[in-house]
Amino acid sequence: MQQPAIMKKTSRGADWSTPESELFAERTVAINGPINADTAVAAVAQLRYLDRNSGDPVTLLVNSPGGSVSDGMAIIDFMRGMRSPIRTHALGIAASMAAVILACGEPGFRSAAPHADILVPQPMSGISGQASDIEIAARSIIRKKEMLAGLLAEVTGRSLEVIEAATDRDTWLTPDEAKSFGIIDRVCADWNYEGSVR
């Protein structure tokens, strides 16, 4: 779908921009779609640019069915090294790695829209091949599951046992349940917290 153009009158005439560039000008970055290498590179590049130019808060909008653990961790590792606080907000869906990214936002500023779907992840892989390949892949999945459980325990304040039980199978949460679980801090339609908040 083609982005609509937005016209702004200036002293020089008219300037044209897209909704995406308007969000970026407001220090807002969107992860929209599966988390993969392209998503990670785009998100990190935008976050880096905003962090270099100011230490003011950045909002990260998340609408993603999840995806690669490695690419999601690249985004999280970069977020954690920024001087700008990262406010996260789920719109639509934040599943699997997207839910982990959502949870890794600035404490007190992690939110979800009232009808967002949030999935606490269980790492998966389509394992095939010889027995030794399957064994190596299984060990890798177990390591990733332990790493994600430790990270979620850290950012939610839940015990490792509670996180491991929740990630033993995919766990779908409403925004209110995600708030109780510690993945988010607020349920609100507006990521600037200007509307109704609970």
Can you name each region flagged by the protein language model?
Residues M1-M97, A103-R198:
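N-terminal organellar transit peptides
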